[in-house]
């Protein structure tokens, strides 16, 4: 999330105006830090703090779902030192924010492919998901090693396997079938998309859901 975000007191929003699902592309952290002659990792650290504040505010407002684009499947081209810090920051964030999630009745969900993530990060993810599974408030969905095209490909593979095993009939496939096999199955489509760096592109994020 762009570290330039300043959290000001939010005016009360009429219940009928509150979005059900907010999706945020968290970019601009490294550039924010570089403009201030700071290392890129400083920007990522401040971005994590902004994510915490926004998550708490969404929980306060009663927003059902908040999806944060934390790490794109295309981010692996970054320097190894930066990637190592991002993995460390992610694991640290998930542990430190457990109390916050429990206090605010937040349930954690994580989407994306796990194949390139360190085992330590996966373990922390699973522990945090299990710990918050009984919470009934805002669903905080973190997109980690996520790509919208990969999500659709994975959904098609699941559907193809079900057709092959005759669990699913080709003629019965419709849009809802695809939605049910996406990483976000069970979630509503976003009705508000925010890109913190202000760029006007979606960067392979929730392609099916926001179309």
Regions found by a protein language model. Give the residues of each.
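Flexible, compositionally biased loop and terminal segments
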Residues: 1-211
């Amino acid at each position: 999330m762009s570290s330039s975000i300043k959290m000001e007191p939010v005016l009360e929003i009429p219940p009928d105006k509150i979005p059900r699902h907010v999706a945020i592309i968290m970019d601009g952290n490294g550039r924010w830090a570089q403009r201030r002659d700071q290392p890129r990792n400083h920007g990522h650290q401040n971005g994590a703090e902004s994510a915490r504040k926004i998550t708490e505010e969404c929980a306060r407002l009663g927003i059902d779902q908040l999806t944060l684009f934390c790490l794109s499947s295309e981010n692996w081209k970054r320097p190894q030192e930066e990637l190592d810090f991002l993995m460390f920051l992610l694991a640290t964030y998930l542990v430190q924010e457990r109390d916050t999630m429990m206090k605010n009745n937040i349930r954690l969900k994580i989407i994306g492919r796990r194949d390139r993530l360190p085992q330590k990060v996966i373990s922390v993810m699973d522990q945090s998901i299990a710990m918050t599974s009984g919470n009934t408030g805002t669903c905080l969905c973190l997109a980690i090693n996520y790509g919208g095209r990969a999500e659709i490909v994975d959904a098609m593979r699941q559907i193809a396997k079900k057709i092959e095993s005759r669990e699913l009939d080709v003629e019965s496939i419709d849009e809802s079938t695809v939605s049910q096999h996406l990483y976000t199955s069970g979630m509503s489509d976003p009705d508000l998309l925010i890109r913190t760096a202000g760029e006007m592109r979606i960067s392979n994020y929730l392609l099916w859901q926001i179309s």
